[in-house]
């Protein structure tokens, strides 16, 4: 995420969409947490959608941050959803405490990426 910032888009229906990119590691934890807290506490959109379609990796700190964002959203009456994650990241988010009903549009890995390489 350090190389590419989080894109923020406001939809006509009142949803705020956050789109991080690439591998999100420990160096990105503070920035991601600040964006999420600002969105939930100050912007207070109808819905906060974390679009992870372009995220290849989430470290444990940021997995916990996304799980905590769901609880923070509940406290502030903001529905938080996670869209477009890979199956692997969706499983990690579920293990970190993100309720299954918050995960939408889970994507299959590309066949080229999941196929064993020829020898």
Specify the residue positions occupied by each region the protein language model found:
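STAS-like cytosolic regulatory interaction modules
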Residues: 1-57, 61, 67-119
């Amino acid at each position: 995420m350090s190389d590419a910032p989080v894109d923020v888009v406001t939809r006509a229906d009142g949803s705020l969409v956050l789109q991080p990119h690439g591998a999100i590691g420990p160096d990105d934890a503070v920035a991601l947490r600040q964006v999420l807290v600002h969105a939930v506490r100050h912007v207070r959109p109808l819905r906060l959608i974390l679009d992870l379609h372009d995220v290849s990796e989430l470290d444990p700190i940021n997995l916990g941050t996304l799980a905590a964002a769901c609880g923070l959203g509940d406290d502030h009456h903001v529905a938080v959803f996670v869209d477009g994650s890979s199956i692997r990241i969706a499983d990690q988010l579920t293990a970190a405490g993100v309720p299954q009903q918050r995960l939408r549009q889970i994507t299959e890995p590309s066949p080229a990426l999941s196929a064993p390489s020829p020898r």
